[in-house]
Curated annotation (Swiss-Prot):
A cellular component annotation (GO) from this entry: ribosome
Entry keywords, A to Z: Ribonucleoprotein, Ribosomal protein, RNA-binding, rRNA-binding
Protein known as: Large ribosomal subunit protein uL4
Single GO BP term: translation
Pfam families noted in UniProt: Ribosomal_L4
PANTHER family documented for this protein: 50S RIBOSOMAL PROTEIN L4 (PTHR10746), LARGE RIBOSOMAL SUBUNIT PROTEIN UL4M (PTHR10746:SF6)
Cleaved signal peptide residues: none
Family: Belongs to the universal ribosomal protein uL4 family.
Binding partners and assembly: Part of the 50S ribosomal subunit.
Organism expressing this protein natively: Colwellia psychrerythraea (strain 34H / ATCC BAA-681) (Vibrio psychroerythus)
Physiological role: One of the primary rRNA binding proteins, this protein initially binds near the 5'-end of the 23S rRNA. It is important during the early stages of 50S assembly. It makes multiple contacts with different domains of the 23S rRNA in the assembled 50S subunit and ribosome. Forms part of the polypeptide exit tunnel.
GO molecular-function terms, A-Z: rRNA binding; structural constituent of ribosome
């Protein structure tokens, strides 16, 4: 199959297996959820009654006061007590096989092509790290909410986009399912397309 180039005449020959496969919604959902779960910090921590300091002394004698019996001030019903089912640090990451991950990426790319949200260009760069220059280039391509994917990290491009809302720059090695589905359009260079094909082949 072929992808038309936005900034030049002609088209780019690409693999049907990478850019023309059927959309697998269940797979994409599973991989996106797993990826988002892996980004969770998981460092929350609360103390149980055995971990809260103090509470060793019996607050008042067992009988004769008229009050309910109590043996500690650190039980969960006390204001300064521990938490009944205390949250503990945990790892939220989920295992995703390489084949599943690559399949999800290919499925997303194919759907972007079908929805005409994948914009392929021969080359995309800025001469100096100036936001104004990048904004002008994106305006010429009628792009606002966009993920820019290049074969390798372009420092000028990265610095130019750093202060722009809903614009991100990634190299091929840094793309992930969440970033691909999180933007209205994906602007990708021809070199990056070939690099992705090589990885997903």
């Amino acid at each position: 199959m072929e992808l038309s180039l936005k900034d030049a005449s002609g088209a780019l020959e690409v693999s049907e297996a990478t850019f023309g496969r059927e959309f697998n919604e269940a797979l994409v959902h599973q991989v996106v959820v797993a990826y988002a779960a892996g980004a969770r910090q998981g460092t929350r921590a609360q103390k149980t009654r055995s971990e809260v300091s103090g509470g060793g002394a019996k607050p008042w004698r067992q009988k004769g006061t008229g009050r309910a019996r109590a043996g500690t001030t650190r039980g969960p019903i006390w204001r300064t007590g521990g938490v009944t089912f205390a949250a503990k640090p945990q790892d939220h990451s989920q295992k995703v096989n390489r084949k599943m991950y690559r399949g999800a990426i290919a499925s997303i790319l194919s759907e972007l092509v079908r929805q005409e949200r994948l914009v392929v260009v021969e080359n995309f760069s800025v001469e100096t790290p100036k936001t104004k220059e990048l904004v002008a280039k994106l305006k010429g391509l009628e792009l606002k909410d966009v993920l820019i994917v290049t074969k390798e990290v372009d420092e000028n491009l990265f610095l130019s986009a750093r202060n722009l809302y809903k614009v991100d720059v990634r190299d091929v090695a840094a793309i992930d399912p969440v970033s691909l589905v999180g933007f209205e359009k994906v602007l990708i260079t021809a070199d990056a397309v070939k690099e992705i094909e090589g990885i997903l082949a």
